[in-house]
């Protein structure tokens, strides 16, 4: 390769695969300019089509797709500016070659071969412009149609979620109302039991008085009294057993109400997140309020900033089973436990726990 070829290759270097001029002539220069402009337009058209394809692959994330499209268009605009600057530089060199050739030819008008080449170049340029404009209009129409379909699908999904949340809330209200009725019946039974115990105590007092009289009687009366006392002790044992069972029932009912409080708070948070509102504090599985020393959780970023120790304390408090060897799921499990299940929360990417914690 000659030194002149190396100089031309270095001067007209490009990343579009367009072959530099073979010689310093107006014909070769115009051939290179025509090929370079066509390749640049194809490159820009390919970038816009890629942006539309990225938009179609992310139908469920409208905001992210629009951001991707905006970035792609910005890159296309930057590339367009770069290619325009390069094209201006190349055109200046080719025009200089043309002025040199016109000076050498010293003719009043361009030669026939030049007019013929210019006519073919203008015709090809107009065809490329029309084709590029048509493809761009088609891409715009297709992108607009896809965006309308995304909006309709997102609106439909949101209505379905609202209906489902409303149904779950009504079911929880009905279950809570039923539990309150059961608690009311249990309290009534406890009142009756207390009344019976008061009557039993009165009878016991009367029985003790009679026992004092019976002690003054014969040994036979003592034996009969011992038998009666044994029977009474059996009755007391049975009453204590019943009382223990009632305490167990009360404990089970308390745990059930605590679980319902946690579920109601979590469902309320799910509804609040659907309207992009911060959540409220969810009581623990046993009904206790989270430790005031623990960081408050009102949004998905609060969970991401938790330390490993605080995250495990929250998971244990809500009764969530977790794998100690797989810490990547801890924050996602905690987000579901407190009701952070909106589309933004589900798409949020958690950072790993810091090794210094």
UniProtKB/Swiss-Prot annotation:
UniProt keyword terms in alphabetical order: Meiosis, Nucleus
Cellular component GO terms held in the UniProt record: nucleoplasm
Gene coding for it: mug135
Organism in which the protein naturally occurs: Schizosaccharomyces pombe (strain 972 / ATCC 24843)
Function as written in the Swiss-Prot or TrEMBL entry: Has a role in meiosis.
Location(s) in or outside the cell: Nucleus
Pfam family, one: Mug135_C
Transmembrane segments: none
The family this protein is said to belong to: Belongs to the UPF0612 family.
A GO BP annotation: meiotic drive
InterPro entries: Mug135-like_C
Protein name: Meiotically up-regulated gene 135 protein
């Amino acid at each position: 390769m000659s030194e002149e070829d190396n100089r031309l290759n270095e001067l007209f270097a490009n990343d579009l695969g367009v072959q530099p001029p073979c010689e310093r002539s107006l014909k070769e220069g115009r051939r290179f300019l025509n090929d370079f402009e066509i390749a640049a337009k194809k490159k820009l058209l390919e970038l816009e089509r890629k942006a539309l394809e990225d938009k179609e692959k992310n139908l469920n994330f409208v905001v992210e797709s629009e951001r991707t499209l905006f970035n792609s268009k910005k890159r296309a605009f930057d590339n367009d500016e770069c290619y325009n600057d390069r094209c201006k530089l190349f055109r200046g060199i080719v025009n200089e070659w043309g002025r040199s050739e016109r000076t050498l030819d010293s003719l009043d008008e361009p030669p026939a071969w030049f007019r013929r080449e210019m006519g073919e170049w203008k015709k090809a340029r107009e065809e490329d412009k029309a084709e590029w404009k048509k493809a761009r209009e088609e891409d715009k129409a297709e992108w607009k149609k896809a965006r309308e379909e995304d909006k309709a699908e997102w609106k439909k999904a949101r209505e379905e979620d609202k209906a489902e949340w409303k149904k779950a809330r009504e079911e929880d209200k009905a279950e809570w109302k039923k539990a309150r009725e059961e608690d009311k019946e249990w309290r009534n039974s406890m009142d009756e039991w207390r009344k019976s115990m008061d009557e039993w105590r009165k009878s016991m007092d009367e029985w003790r008085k009679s026992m004092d009289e019976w002690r003054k009687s014969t040994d036979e009366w003592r034996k009969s009294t011992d038998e009666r006392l044994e029977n009474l002790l059996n009755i007391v044992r049975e009453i204590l057993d019943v009382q223990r069972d009632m305490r167990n029932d009360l404990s089970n009912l308390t745990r059930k109400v605590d679980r319902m409080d946690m579920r109601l708070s979590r469902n309320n948070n799910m509804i609040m997140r659907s309207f992009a509102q911060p959540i409220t504090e969810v009581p623990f599985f046993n009904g206790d309020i989270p430790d005031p020393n623990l960081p408050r959780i009102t949004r998905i970023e609060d969970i991401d900033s938790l330390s490993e120790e605080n995250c495990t304390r929250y998971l244990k408090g809500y009764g969530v089973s977790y794998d100690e060897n797989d810490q990547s799921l801890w924050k996602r499990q905690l987000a579901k436990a407190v009701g952070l299940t909106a589309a933004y929360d589900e798409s949020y990417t958690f950072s790993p726990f810091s090794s210094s914690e």
